[in-house]
Amino acid sequence: MARIAGVDIPRDKRVVISLTYIFGIGRTTAQQVLKEAGVSEDTRVRDLTEEELGKIRDIIDKLKVEGDLRREVSLNIKRLIEIGSYRGIRHRRGLPVRGQNSKNNARTRKGPRRTVANKKK
């Protein structure tokens, strides 16, 4: 396995797919990186030369990926919570942040149902 940005990327997959294993790189960014490096998208990782891998590493080093990106996202959420914005409050309560309905759905964000016991009559 080749190692790029601290991530082992699979050798048997196409390069454009393998790069998406890195947090912060999706299909579009992977295609842009390969175009800039002059590498075909259809090439398998095992067929890349050290020179091509070096070019790809250099380009990805300029991008914000993995730990740096995760840290930035968590700091952004922390900032929203600290300033007391609506989005920050939704994050704190564990509810959907982007205006989705939360009366019936939103189970992923709210977690499993907590049933409330009925009072005895």
Curated annotation (Swiss-Prot):
Residue segments, region Disordered: 93-121
Record field: compositional bias (Basic residues): 106-121
Alphabetized PROSITE patterns for the sequence: RIBOSOMAL_S13_1, RIBOSOMAL_S13_2
Keyword ATP-binding (UniProt): no
Pfam families per UniProt: Ribosomal_S13
Annotated GO CC locations: cytosol; small ribosomal subunit
InterPro entries associated with the record: Rbsml_uS13_C, Ribosomal_uS13, Ribosomal_uS13-like_H2TH, Ribosomal_uS13_bac-type, Ribosomal_uS13_CS
GO aspect biological process, one term: translation
Keyword annotations: Ribonucleoprotein, Ribosomal protein, RNA-binding, rRNA-binding, tRNA-binding
Gene Ontology molecular function: rRNA binding; structural constituent of ribosome; tRNA binding
HAMAP family found in the cross-reference section: Ribosomal_uS13
Functional description taken from the UniProt entry: Located at the top of the head of the 30S subunit, it contacts several helices of the 16S rRNA. In the 70S ribosome it contacts the 23S rRNA (bridge B1a) and protein L5 of the 50S subunit (bridge B1b), connecting the 2 subunits; these bridges are implicated in subunit movement. Contacts the tRNAs in the A and P-sites.
Family: Belongs to the universal ribosomal protein uS13 family.
Subunit annotation: Part of the 30S ribosomal subunit. Forms a loose heterodimer with protein S19. Forms two bridges to the 50S subunit in the 70S ribosome.
Listed name of the protein: Small ribosomal subunit protein uS13
Originating organism: Bacillus subtilis (strain 168)
Lineage: Bacteria, Bacillati, Bacillota, Bacilli, Bacillales
